[in-house]
């Protein structure tokens, strides 16, 4: 069942499935931000965020930097 899978995933990876996916998305965004000149909303869309503002919040929470700070 779902709770069993969630527990096993967290036991294996140390984070919830949702957190794992979020981290992978932010990792992908870092590569895109460094290698392209795409606008922030385009990067957000490319990695699966529908809201670029929420993407920026998640990015800052995970990296400790704003998107702008990271890109400089």
Model segments located where?
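Terminal helix-turn-helix DNA-binding modules in bacterial transcription factors
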Residues: 11-53, 72
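Residues in the helix-turn-helix
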Residues: 4, 39, 53-54, 66
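Histidine-centered phosphotransfer motif of kinases
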Residues: 1
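…primarily DNA-binding HTH/wHTH and HhH modules…
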Residues: 57-72
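Short hydrophobic/aromatic patch on the recognition helix
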Residues: 5, 9, 54-55, 59
